[in-house]
Amino acid sequence: MKTNAGRFFEDYRLGETIAHAVPRTVSGGERALYHALYPARHALSSSDEFARACGLPAAPVDELMAFHLVFGKTVPDISLNAVANLGYAEGRWLKPVFPGDTLRAESTVIGLKENSNGASGVVWVRTRGLNQQGEAVLSYVRWVMVRKRDTAAPAPAPTVPELAGSVAASDLVIPEGLSFTDYDLTLAGEPHRWGDYAVGEKIDHVDGVTVEESEHMLATRLWQNTAKVHFDATNRPDGRRLIYGGHVISLARTLSFNGLANAQMIVALNAGAHANPCFAGDTVRAWSEVLDKAETADPGVGALRLRLVAMKHGTEPFVTRSEDGKYLPGVLLDLDYWALVPR
């Protein structure tokens, strides 16, 4: 048999490392298409000249674009037969990615636990994205609910990894050369620096985007993400194509420009949950909350820990859960990340 039906829960072994196929050379074409698919306007990843003024050799690609490219490499081996992508932790961007870089990915299985229904289980993996020099550019943990091929297959001994609640500010990687000494607030689009944000502050990002069927499938193909639920309408009982969760992340992040234009680089992903599914026709809006602030090794660069929530139009902002503790039906995404901001 020459075709690949993908892995099922019983195919994973604790401690195994999976080298994912098909390296990807990044070009300016991907960046142009990213900016066409999402309302991306952050200056550092838009302008070579702005990036050079900030000490970088050129404009890096958007950090989430690098994430999607690495994530897409993992799908055929990790989540082709997934029921749902459940969460993220311990994500760190370690080096900027520039056009011309070639990315590949590898994942190590760090946890396995069969569900009580015996029909699926949860797989935890730590994924690394590597460039052409073999340098890690990105590392993160995610956990996925995966179907079993044979419900009678014996369950592995349950192993649930202990994961950090957040990435410590001292572990944030400031890209080599990055300096905001000559940062141009006018060109960046907003006057707000690190000191202008207060812990507990909440920001409604005002704008919204209605998701189109063709756009979300085009974006998911751009990342070479082959998960069946995003393309095949016969793969779900409701006959609908599920929007790739990363598509919602990028929509929310780019909408956050309105209020967080100077949050120029994402450097860590503390946690994340796809609270409810998103489908074509949904209009996505976003709000943020400042969870923490930290100084960095560079006196001109500060870090903001931000909570980014994506919600469907009509959902009340700044509220995520009902009285029973469950996410409200209109909440799509609840993401916790660190970003670099000029001081």
Curated annotation (Swiss-Prot):
Swiss-Prot/TrEMBL induction comment: Strongly up-regulated during growth on acetate as sole carbon source.
Gene3D superfamilies: Hotdog Thioesterase
Observed effect of gene inactivation: Cells lacking this gene are not able to grow on acetate as a sole carbon source.
One MF annotation (Gene Ontology) recorded for this entry: oxo-acid-lyase activity
Lyase in keyword set: yes
Keywords: Lyase
Record-listed substrate binding positions: P60, V61, D62, E63, V83, A84, N85, L86, L94, K95, P96
SUPFAM superfamilies tied to this protein: Thioesterase/thiol ester dehydrase-isomerase
GO BP annotations listed: acetate catabolic process
EC number: 4.2.1.148
pH-activity profile: Optimum pH is 7.5.
InterPro entries in UniProt: HotDog_dom_sf, MC_hydratase, MCH/BMMD, Thiol_ester_hydratase_Rv0216
Keyword match Lyase: yes
Pfam family, one: MC_hydratase
Catalytic reaction annotation: (2R,3S)-beta-methylmalyl-CoA = 2-methylfumaryl-CoA + H2O
MaoC-like domain boundaries: 47-116
Functional summary from the UniProt entry: Involved in the ethylmalonyl-CoA pathway for acetate assimilation. Catalyzes the reversible hydration of mesaconyl-CoA (2-methylfumaryl-CoA) to yield beta-methylmalyl-CoA ((2R,3S)-beta-methylmalyl-CoA).
Protein name stated in the entry: Mesaconyl-CoA hydratase
Gene responsible for this protein: mch
